[in-house]
């Protein structure tokens, strides 16, 4: 089946990236940084860990659909107290 379509209509593909806010301590990122240094990757100066979601939605990536993705990300995919998010068409 061609990219961007499914039997019965168009499919929009959206990538949502969720990251801890900069002021939130990231122990997992720090552990990865220590491992990088231990393994000889001394040029790695910092690591922040996050989540990536790939959504397939019925329809086209118009203003209405992107607004719904923002609602979904803010209510389900991210914890707005400690995380921020960004999304884009894939």
Model-derived regions, located:
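Non-catalytic terminal accessory/regulatory regions of metabolic enzymes
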Residues: 1-90
